[in-house]
């Protein structure tokens, strides 16, 4: 495989996610993948002809029926296989309501995307919250202040 082909392969496997908040809640997706039900943010693979920003906006539209605009980049995580995962803070108009959309790459009678909903941090499991912190949620207005109000107790299994 040539270097150009390797880079093209890695680029297609890279992902972008959209962090959308409203009134102290985070737009989340309830999904069932690999035998596990969990919550995550809208996002997916970057197509060959798009930027990470364009991918985040496209995934938000496909999966949640929302038209958003990038506010700013939050994080870039590099995976061991060379792929990258980009996260962006995204704003949506106040008059738009999320709907459960689709993932055009997932076909069949039982798609993984089950529901789209607004959730507060205390409604999200610690495991799923860990991914939100990795995506840069603490940089989004209001969420760092919420974390400062939390206690110092250890609440996860030892």
Describe the function of each predicted region.
Residues 22-62:
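Conserved Nudix-box catalytic region and its N-terminal flanking loop in Nudix hydrolases
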Residues 2-8, 102-107:
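Short, P/G- and charge-enriched loop/turn segments at secondary-structure junctions
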Residues 28, 87-89, 118:
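Conserved hydrophobic/aromatic beta-strand scaffold that supports enzyme active sites
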Residues 23-25, 32, 91-96, 121-123:
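Short loop segments at secondary-structure junctions
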Residues 36-37, 100-158:
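Nudix hydrolase/Nudix homology domain
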Residues 3-27, 48:
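Conserved N-terminal beta-strand and adjoining loop/helix that marks the start
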Residues 65-105:
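Active-site segment of metal-dependent pyrophosphate-handling enzymes
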Residues 13-17, 83-87, 113-116:
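Short hydrophobic/aromatic beta-strand or adjacent loop that forms the aromatic wall/cage
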